[in-house]
Amino acid sequence: MSGFSPELIDYLEGKISFEEFERRREERKTREKKSLQEKGKLSAEENPDDSEVPSSSGINSTKSQDKDVNEGETSDGVRKSVHKVFASMLGENEDDEEEEEEEEEEEEEEETPEQPTAGDVFVLEMVLNRETKKMMKEKRPRSKLPRALRGLMGEANIRFARGEREEAILMCMEIIRQAPLAYEPFSTLAMIYEDQGDMEKSLQFELIAAHLNPSDTEEWVRLAEMSLEQDNIKQAIFCYTKALKYEPTNVRYLWERSSLYEQMGDHKMAMDGYRRILNLLSPSDGERFMQLARDMAKSYYEANDVTSAINIIDEAFSKHQGLVSMEDVNIAAELYISNKQYDKALEIITDFSGIVLEKKTSEEGTSEENKAPENVTCTIPDGVPIDITVKLMVCLVHLNILEPLNPLLTTLVEQNPEDMGDLYLDVAEAFLDVGEYNSALPLLSALVCSERYNLAVVWLRHAECLKALGYMERAAESYGKVVDLAPLHLDARISLSTLQQQLGQPEKALEALEPMYDPDTLAQDANAAQQELKLLLHRSTLLFSQGKMYGYVDTLLTMLAMLLKVAMNRAQVCLISSSKSGERHLYLIKVSRDKISDSNDQESANCDAKAIFAVLTSVLTKDDWWNLLLKAIYSLCDLSRFQEAELLVDSSLEYYSFYDDRQKRKELEYFGLSAAILDKNFRKAYNYIRIMVMENVNKPQLWNIFNQVTMHSQDVRHHRFCLRLMLKNPENHALCVLNGHNAFVSGSFKHALGQYVQAFRTHPDEPLYSFCIGLTFIHMASQKYVLRRHALIVQGFSFLNRYLSLRGPCQESFYNLGRGLHQLGLIHLAIHYYQKALELPPLVVEGIELDQLDLRRDIAYNLSLIYQSSGNTGMAQTLLYTYCSI
C-alpha cells in the first residue's frame, strides 16, 4: 500500500467519507501542480541558456528525422494525415488530449500541410470500416491503463471469473499501485467484493472508479441508488450532483436530488433544485409546471419565505394563465394577504375566479366640489368556493371597501361555525385589524360558543375585542378563559391582571401573575426562563404598587437568582422558601460547600446558564439588571434583612458582568460594607474597609468608617495593618492618629504619646489632639511604677486646660476634665466640673439626634459613684432617679 495516496488509504479504511476523499485528492493535485511550476521556474532561472531558442540546424535535423520515420506515422502504422482526414470527415476530435497536443506541435513545426495520397485513401477506407464497427457498440471512455498493465488487468478478470478472488485482488492492487488513475482495477475490485456480499466495500471501490471515470452519468445514478440502500443520503446527493455535472438538464436527476435535500432538511438547496426544474420544463408541460409551482409555494410559505412563494406563484400565473385553478387562486390570495398586499390579492381573485366588483356612481352632484358617492357592488358566480369569498371579504375590509360586505357577511353567518370556524376567525381578525370591533364581536361570539372552535386563541381575540369596546368585566372573563385553556400564555395573564387591578380586585390580579414554571424547568429551558422573567417583572411592579414588600422582594430575588445562578453557587448562597415569618417567603442563606452540586452537574448547569443568560439579557439590558439588583438590596435593608443583603452582594461580586465593570464593582463593595455594618458583622466589614483604605489612603471618610469598624470588632489584627500602612505613608494624618489610638488601647502610652504629638504639631488648634495628649499623660501618671508622677500630672492637666480653651465651655469639655480628675482621685475638683457639666445642655449637631450627644446620664452616674463611696447614698439615689431612670 506504500504506493497509494494517503487519502485513498484513509477512505478504504473507512476513516473519511467519499466527499472528503475527493476534496483531499483535488487539494493534493493542486499542491503538486504548484510545486512543479515553482520547480520549473527555479530551473529556468538556474539554466537560462536552456530557455533560449535552439539552433536552426537542430530544428532541421528534427524535421528530417520526423519525415524519415514513417512520415509521422502513429503507433498503429497509419499516417497522422490520414487521421486528420478521417477526423474531418466524421467531424469528431481525438479522445486522447495528449495526442491532440502532439498534433498541434506537429502542425506548428510543419510549414506546409501534407496532402493525402491514394494509399492514404485506401488506408482510410480500412479505418472507416473498423471505426464503424466500434461506433455500433457503446462508446467507452478512453482507458488510462498503460499497455504494459492491460495483460495483468485481463489476468485479474480471468482469475475473478475462475473464483480465485484473493489472487485477483492482489493483481488489482498491484495495478492500482502502478497506475492509480486507471478506473478498471477499482471496478473489478467492486465486482469482487459485491460477489463476496460486502456491499459497503463494493460501493467504496465503485465510487473511486466513478471518480476516475466521471463522465459516466448512469454509473453515478446507480451509485446514488446504492447509497440510498445503505441510508447514506448525503453520499447519494453527492452522486446526483456528479451526474448533473455532465447532464445539467436532466430533470429526473434534479428531482431526485431536490427530494433528498428535503429529507436532509436543506430547504434552500431543495428549492433551488426545483426552481431549476421549472426553468427546464417546456411550455407543453404546463400541468407539471403548475403542480410543482404550487408545491414550492406551499413549501416556501411553511418556511416563512413569503416573498419567494409569491415570486413562484406569479411566474406560474404569468406563464400558464389558462391552467390556473381555484386552488391556485386560493393559494395566491393567501400569500398576498399574509404579505399585507391586499390590493394584489383582490386583483388575483377578481381576475381568475369570475368575481366582479363594480363601482356605480349616483347622478346627484356632478361638480368636482361635490363628488358623487360611489356604490360598490359585488357579483359572485356559482361554484366559487367559500374560502375565496372569505379572502375577498378580508381584502375588502382592509381596503376600506365596506359597501358589499353586508350580503357577504350574511352568506358567511349562514354557514355552520363548527365547519367554517377558521373562515369566521379570518374575517373577525380583519375587522379587528382595522378597528371595526362591533363587526368582529358577533363573529367571535359565535366561535366561542361553538365546541370545535372554543379555543384559547379565539377567546383571546374575543377578550381583546371586548376590551376595545370598553366591556371590562366581560373582557376579564374572556381573558380568564384564555388562561384556563392556555396557562402558559403570558400576554393573556398580563392583560387579565391589568384588568382585574383596574376593576379593584388586587388579589385576583396577583393570582393571575402566579409563576408558570417550576425551578427545574427554568434551569433547563431558556424560553421558559424568558417568559417567566417577563411575568415576574409585571408581578413585581404590581406588588410594589400594593405595598407588599415581602412579596416584592420574593419576585426580585427570583429574577436575580435566574441571572446569578452560577455566581450564587460560587458564593455558596442558596435561595430557599420558608415560613419563619408566618407566611411563606423566599430567603437567601449561606450553605456549606458539600451541599453545592458536584463538578459534573456544575458544568452542565454552566452550559444551561449560558443559554439562559443570553435569553435573559435579551429581555433586560445590563443596566436594567443592575437597577433590579439595587432595588433588591435597598428593599432587603428596608426590611432589616441585612444578612441577606450581604449574601446578595457576595453573589453579585461573583458575577463576571458586574465584577468586570470597575464602577459597579466599587459600588457593590460599598453596599457590602454598609450591609455588614448594619448587620454588625464587623469582621466582614473590616475585610471591605481594609481594601478601600489601601486604595484611598487620603480619604478621611473611609478612615472614619475604619475607626468605627475596628472599634466594634473587638479585634486587634488592624494594629499591624495600620503600622505597615504607616511605613508606606508616613505623612498620612489619619494613620498617625489611629496608630496613636491603637497604642493607647494596647497600653503603649509612650508610643501613643509620640503619635499624638506628631498629629498635634501638624494641627495644633485641633482640640482632640490636646485632649488625647492630656489623657495619655494622666494614664501614665496613674501607673503603679512611674518616675516624676507630679510632672506628668501637671503636663496632662496643662493639655486638658488647652483642650478646654479650644473646645470652649460645654457639657463635653467639663465632663472630660472631670473624668481626668476623677481618675486621679481628686474628688472635690471632679465634683466641681461634673456639676458644671450637668448644668449645661447637650450639644446640637446637625444629622445626629440630641439624645445621642446628651452626657447627663454619664455625668450623674459618675457623681453617684463619688457620693456613694463617701457614704452619701441619698444624694447618689437622687441623681440616679433624676437622670438615669427609664
Curated annotation (Swiss-Prot):
Subcellular location: Nucleus
Any one of the GO BP annotations: transcription by RNA polymerase III
TPR repeat copies, ranges: 149-182, 183-216, 217-250, 252-284, 290-323, 326-361, 421-454, 456-489, 491-523, 733-766, 811-844
Record's function text: Involved in RNA polymerase III-mediated transcription. Integral, tightly associated component of the DNA-binding TFIIIC2 subcomplex that directly binds tRNA and virus-associated RNA promoters.
GO MF assignments: DNA binding; RNA polymerase III general transcription initiation factor activity
GO cellular component terms, semicolon-separated: fibrillar center; nuclear membrane; nucleoplasm; transcription factor TFIIIC complex
Compositionally skewed regions (Acidic residues) per UniProt: 92-113
Gene responsible for this protein: GTF3C3
Pfam families linked: TPR_8
Protein name: General transcription factor 3C polypeptide 3
Compositionally biased residues, Polar residues: 53-63
SMART domains the UniProt entry points to: TPR
